[in-house]
């Protein structure tokens, strides 16, 4: 009898044997329902359906995201994208690029930047299937990030309400 990948993962998690998600450089814990919460940092292949523009002839691009909120029906996760360089296309956009220091996040190789200008809508099931759990934003960073996202005009109030930010 064949069982699905999701069922296999559930069995392993129930037995206390958390499998690892791996890219070429790192191993991550598989994302569990408990990991999908505000402030979680997840490594996932982003696709066009997430609202992310995949460049070149690729189907996906591996990215770090930070969970900002979850829809009321618990199906869609609102996330911000982490970049290696700040997006400073114009001043207002540069002002909402939040620095994430390597000393606070040991799994990064360098200082990174959280782009607080756009919420990406990623299905919860896709995060559970393909994501790697990395950890959480520090409490001090979270307070500043939350206020930045709550007050930015780059994200619509309806999107903020949809994900419980307002």
What are these language model-derived features?
Residues 1-14, 18-19, 96-166:
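C-terminal terminal-subdomain/extension
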Residues 52-104:
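Compact nucleic-acid interaction/catalytic patches
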Residues 17-27:
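Short, structured beta-strand/loop micro-motifs enriched in basic residues and often containing a Trp
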Residues 38-39:
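Loop/turn positions that initiate beta-strands
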Residues 30-35:
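Short, surface-exposed secondary-structure edge patches
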